[in-house]
Amino acid sequence: MDKTTEEIAQDFTAMGHSVTLITDIIAGNAMADDTAEDKQGCVDRNVEHLELMVAKDYWTTEDMTDVESAITAGNNYTA
């Protein structure tokens, strides 16, 4: 089943939410009161989501720079 342009845009927006969450956790601006285990789990889940999504074959002109940066930062993160 092919995705519509709207569905692809929604996927890209969701990826942006994961990028923001990963970045904010690493910067200490999100989940500050959570345990290291919870922060690590959240980063790991969001990195996995981004890795799965960036591998999709329906992307065209979307800029994945921030996504790739968040994947790298998340993979290097230890809470």
What is the meaning of each model-derived region?
Residues M1-A79:
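Beta-rich interaction/scaffold domains
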